[in-house]
Amino acid sequence: MARYTGPVEKIERRLGVSLELKGERRLAGKSALDKRPYAPGQHGQRRTKISEYGLQLREKQKIKFYYGVLEKQFRKFFREANRQEGNTGENLIKLLERRLDNVVYRMGFASTRRFARQLVTHGHILVNGKKVNIPSYLVKEGDRIEIREKSKNNVQIQRALELSQQTGIAPWVDVDKEKLVGVFQRVPEREEVNIPVEERLVVELYSK
């Protein structure tokens, strides 16, 4: 399955929730979901009853688009979450929060996860002083994440830092905005992650 490259705001309208896919437009209240809070298409405003399977599938899609992962990656993360002790759904969210592209976003170095993924793949990010260009790389507690020296004046990065003054920085990371360096202090608790999803439905989907 190829990565989705179409209009991301259509996804939010179809799923009916904000998935933080558009940074500035979302903050300004100008996103397509704000203007048209119903599904796209001729029959978008009709209310239709969704089956149990449909609800489970929708929750899975929310998580996939929220973190920008493909089906193969998602299944890999789910299997790992299921192997771990504790609540599988919570484990899944915690694992996805450790993805390098997500941590870059949480630190305020990118206004969207899509841009954060580009920063990683294009070699702009260092982890503990070494370049890592794999978005799915799992960050560990204490890891030092920084923008490489040549990229620190990137206009989009600077703009993202300005926007982070409105959105705030995740409490589980520590960031020096002047040096463009952050430390992943701890894995967040599920209640700290404001993702509009019922992950238990995803667990039910894969338990069939």
Curated annotation (Swiss-Prot):
Summary of subunit composition and partner proteins: Part of the 30S ribosomal subunit. Contacts protein S5. The interaction surface between S4 and S5 is involved in control of translational fidelity.
Origin: domain of life: Bacteria
Family: Belongs to the universal ribosomal protein uS4 family.
Function comment: One of the primary rRNA binding proteins, it binds directly to 16S rRNA where it nucleates assembly of the body of the 30S subunit. With S5 and S12 plays an important role in translational accuracy.
Pfam family, one: S4
Molecular-function annotations in GO: rRNA binding; structural constituent of ribosome
HAMAP family noted in UniProt: Ribosomal_uS4_B (MF_01306_B)
Swiss-Prot/TrEMBL keywords: Ribonucleoprotein, Ribosomal protein, RNA-binding, rRNA-binding
Sequence ranges assigned to domain S4 RNA-binding in this UniProt record: 98-160
GO BP terms: ribosomal small subunit biogenesis; translation
PANTHER family the UniProt entry points to: 30S 40S RIBOSOMAL PROTEIN, SMALL RIBOSOMAL SUBUNIT PROTEIN US4M
InterPro entries for the chain: Ribosomal_uS4 (IPR022801), Ribosomal_uS4_bac-type (IPR005709), Ribosomal_uS4_CS (IPR018079), Ribosomal_uS4_N (IPR001912), S4_RNA-bd (IPR002942), S4_RNA-bd_sf (IPR036986)
Spans through the membrane: none
One term under GO cellular component: small ribosomal subunit
Descriptive protein name: Small ribosomal subunit protein uS4
